[in-house]
């Protein structure tokens, strides 16, 4: 009997030769694919693709990435990730395993859960002593135009970023049937959520506008994390804040919208 669920894998290895970054190995199976990388200064921009209408409940996804010393990579999804339901409320199970010894920026962009869908995501990032890592992801709580906000079963996401010791641990758990997005202390009715991290120090700030809430704070290791809830404008504001942080870091500007419709 052929399983109706799909197992997808992606393995990527980046190395540096003569000051330039090269994609040394790319293995894909199932719905995950990559396009050819684009040059970005001394580094590369690589788009991740998911074939088909989205990830179906019961599907299993595993992405493994190794960025060797000296390599510089921007990794992003070409389009938003759609989480679709399956019989029996099986979740999409996604595992992200990154070993970073060089420089990696990871932008999965927007995840959109459809009604009755569920997502179980785990991301583990191992950082070398000279590594630089940044990450930003966004969630829409459903398709707003169809009135589907908060109609999914659950989203459970665990993030662990560590070196010799844990640097950053985060747990996101949204259960609309128990605590909906309008419940006090949850999302206050806001339909978008954005979160991010980078392993260098930024100036903390917090802003509250008619569009929502957005802020940057520091961990005990002086690394930076970003959180925001609000409407679509808050996600765009988060990207602007991140663009400013990259400029302060001395990183060359990159138009991520050129490579991804998920942001």
UniProtKB/Swiss-Prot annotation:
Keywords: Chaperone, Cytoplasm, Nickel insertion. Its main location: cytoplasm. The keyword Protein biosynthesis does not apply. It is found in: Cytoplasm. One of its GO terms (cellular component) is cytoplasm. GO terms for molecular function: nickel cation binding. Belongs to the UreD family. Required for maturation of urease via the functional incorporation of the urease nickel metallocenter. PANTHER family: UREASE ACCESSORY PROTEIN D. UreD, UreF and UreG form a complex that acts as a GTP-hydrolysis-dependent molecular chaperone, activating the urease apoprotein by helping to assemble the nickel containing metallocenter of UreC. The UreE protein probably delivers the nickel. This is Urease accessory protein UreD 1. It comes from Synechococcus sp. (strain JA-3-3Ab). The lineage of its organism: Bacteria, Bacillati, Cyanobacteriota, Cyanophyceae, Synechococcales.
